[in-house]
Amino acid sequence: MECLYYFLGFLLLAARLPLDAAKRFHDVLGNERPSAYMREHNQLNGWSSDENDWNEKLYPVWKRGDMRWKNSWKGGRVQAVLTSDSPALVGSNITFAVNLIFPRCQKEDANGNIVYEKNCRNEAGLSADPYVYNWTAWSEDSDGENGTGQSHHNVFPDGKPFPHHPGWRRWNFIYVFHTLGQYFQKLGRCSVRVSVNTANVTLGPQLMEVTVYRRHGRAYVPIAQVKDVYVVTDQIPVFVTMFQKNDRNSSDETFLKDLPIMFDVLIHDPSHFLNYSTINYKWSFGDNTGLFVSTNHTVNHTYVLNGTFSLNLTVKAAAPGPCPPPPPPPRPSKPTPSLATTLKSYDSNTPGPAGDNPLELSRIPDENCQINRYGHFQATITIVEGILEVNIIQMTDVLMPVPWPESSLIDFVVTCQGSIPTEVCTIISDPTCEITQNTVCSPVDVDEMCLLTVRRTFNGSGTYCVNLTLGDDTSLALTSTLISVPDRDPASPLRMANSALISVGCLAIFVTVISLLVYKKHKEYNPIENSPGNVVRSKGLSVFLNRAKAVFFPGNQEKDPLLKNQEFKGVS
């Protein structure tokens, strides 16, 4: 009898050993074990419990630090990158994306095989074999041996067969997602996406873990593991962007007085969960202007005082949500009994059949219940003085002396409103204002009237776009204009005037020289003692003209001055 007990104990032990040796999903995918409450209340649609058995024969399990990881991929290690569009409003879908990054010079081709990139050299140099992994050939060999596409190794770790959708043989990576005590298996290529509905997910941060396997003949080899934290919230994720026309830096939340600020509300809703919801925006700008309620996601507001203000925004949306439990049916009214009767009836009270209450039959749960969800945003805004406006009131062409240079100088007379600028910048571009040709910035010293002249150089004639900016520590004010610079041809009015002045000057100098020469000759060949006074006075002008004629026309006169003297004597 004692031997029989030993034999039965041995059989029980032998039967128990395979159960103890078999791994489960939670043993492979993570050490964090959710509580029984979380397992019960976080049921994800299409996911399975991690209490299921893991097929370790097809999908070997390697711990971190195992030396086999170094040889899991030819040419290096594969890195998996896990991202999500978290945070997610409870009830909406959250999407996870996994992308595989291969070693240098490797990529996935159109057939799902891993090949070397052309003309790419890695540490091992150029490879004669174009394939890193030729899974197409492996798949054909496997089908040839089995004679059918239904193979015992085309299954997931829990034994479920691969879905045979078109092109499934080109998908050679197996992704196992694990969160909240549940797992999801997916066959894919070098990148996959998985969406999860968060209606039953506990609020707060949660952990998603992913293990990636690759084909290896008739089995699979782990190549990467990755994890990431995602957040499920009952608050609408809200972001607000603020923009002001002349604000120098919108990220510092410092803005200008007397200029409108545009507030734009961005709701993080990548799954479009709130597309059919009515959304209300309630604003409090903190400047005693009261509350402003709108259904538009953009609003403008102008602060008229300097200082610091607290901005508050509340977003309200009616979103699909769980229906509240029906209220308990009202008890039928009865005459008020005595205390002893009450105690007796309480002890013997038993619930009656549900059909006795006609109200219970009409209480059918509404499947389209809605619940109000709220989102909040707060910011502290500083309002300061700034340059509000800038205008170009006059443009003047600066006249240059001869020789005329190739460039032109233009003076811009500029006025501004608001604070006093400390610098001026001009950007000279083509007529479309897209191709910048020149940028000049310089400090300025402006009086309280804010009137200044900016001189800029233009290289050559043509039409230019001029952007002129006045700035200080907190603001930038911009104005633009188109200017046409004329061609500087030699026949310009100023050039002609200068040429005329030069010609007149040269003529005056020439006449002066001739007059001096004539005067010198007249003094040398007109003896005073031999000429009577009356003749000199009456004939002086004739003599002067004759002598000038002799100088200009020497061929028609006698060359001997003695003959001239004799002639004048004969006349007298």
UniProtKB/Swiss-Prot annotation:
InterPro entries: Ig-like_fold, PKAT, PKAT_KLD, PKD/Chitinase_dom, PKD_dom, PKD_dom_sf
Extracellular topology ranges: 23-498
GO biological process: cell adhesion; cell-cell signaling; negative regulation of cell population proliferation; negative regulation of cytokine production; negative regulation of G1/S transition of mitotic cell cycle; negative regulation of T cell activation; negative regulation of T cell proliferation; negative regulation of tumor necrosis factor production
Molecular function (Gene Ontology), one example: chemoattractant activity
Sequence ranges of Polar residues compositional bias: 338-351
Cytoplasmic side: 520-572
Gene: GPNMB
The protein's name: Transmembrane glycoprotein NMB
Keywords from the UniProt entry: Amyloidosis, Cell membrane, Disease variant, Endosome, Glycoprotein, Membrane, Phosphoprotein, Signal, Transmembrane, Transmembrane helix
Family: Belongs to the PMEL/NMB family.
